Structures are given as C-alpha cells and as structure tokens.
Amino acid sequence: MEATNQNLDSVLKKLRKLQNLYEGAKKINSEGEANAAAAAIQRLLTQYNLSMDEIGTDEEKAKDTVFEEKVDGFTYKSIGGEWEFRLLYVLCKWNFCKCFQVGSTYRRLMIFGKKENIETVKWLRGMLAERFVAFSKNRFKEYKKTMEYAMKPISMDKYQRSYLMGCAAGLDAKLKEESDREKAKNAEFRAKVTALVVRNDAAVTEYIE
C-alpha cells in the first residue's frame, strides 16, 4: 500500500465506491462478510490518511483538523444494552478516531477525529448495526430450536444484547488481524502507520484537552 503513489481524490473515490457497493447493506449476508467489508473500508481509510499526511497540500492539511460530534448510543431501544457504544468504540479505535461516553451513560456518545474519519466511522456504524441486528433476529430463531433454549429459555432482547456484544468483539479481532497483516507485509509501511497513529492520537488528545 504505497500512499505516495496515490492521489487523494483517487483514494477518496475508491472509498466512496466501496461504500456505495455496500449501501443498503442487504448484500452483506453474514457476520464474516460484514467484518470483511469493515476491513476493506479500514484499508482505504488508512491509505487516505497516509496520503494526506505525506502528499496533501498545506491547504488540505489545514482543513484536515480534529472535530467532535455527539451521537446517539441508544438507537435500537427495543434491544438496549451497551453494544452500540462497544461497536462505535471498536470502529473508532481502528479508524483514527476516539469515542467516549458523555457523563456516565452509554446512551450519549462523543466522537473525536478528523472529518473524513468521523464520517466513515458513522457510516460503518450505521451499516454494521443494521446488519448485525438483522443477523441477531435470525440467530435467535435458530437458537429457539436448540435444547439449550428448551432447558433455559431467555428473552429475545437479552439474547440479542449478548450476540451483538459478540459481534463487536469479533469485529475488533478482525480489524486487528487485518491491521497486523498489512503491517507485516512491509516494514516501511508499518513504520509509517505507527507514526501516523501516534501523531493522530496526539492531535485528538490535544483537541480534547
């Protein structure tokens, strides 16, 4: 992944094209496909950030500053639980943003990061949440046919909360695996990404403080 050979507009076009491919999310039919889609977006967003860092003009870099945005962490009210916060936290973690609870509740969240990164994280969160919730309903139907359910039945929302927390954990593992694999391919790329993450974290931390 050579960022210096990529035009910023070209990278953004690829990112938009991939988002459009997954728009509507119905083409994603399994947890594995959902995680793979998120990993593909992650690769392009990393490429975009490296390109901006290395070949972006002074004007582009001046506009590429840290922002903050409040988001709802309780959009699926019939399910409840902290899974939406956990999902957003994972996406921020691997896409150059930070996510915090506002006060003591997971229902109100704040994202910090550069504009393109925040927009991508929000898009991923919406797409993945919709798919994971749809999967959870199907998995619950299957679970109700098992001996485990017959012996100790649980409500659908309780099952979904557990399942969706598992989806967030699985996504975290997939994105870490993808990041490690990309870094292992090229020592120079690994060094650039590590340095970029450090600088980005410092910029976000400075903004928050």
Label the predicted regions.
Residues E2-K13, L50-E209:
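Extended, helix-rich structural scaffolds rather than catalytic motifs
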Residues V11-A25, L44:
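Non-transmembrane amphipathic alpha-helical segments
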Residues K27-N29:
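Inter-helical turn/loop segments and adjacent helix faces that build the functional surface
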Residues E31-A39:
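Short, charged, amphipathic alpha-helical segments
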Residues A39-R43, Y89:
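Contiguous, well-ordered alpha-helical segments that form the cores/surfaces of helical PPI scaffolds
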Residues R43-S51:
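Short arginine-rich
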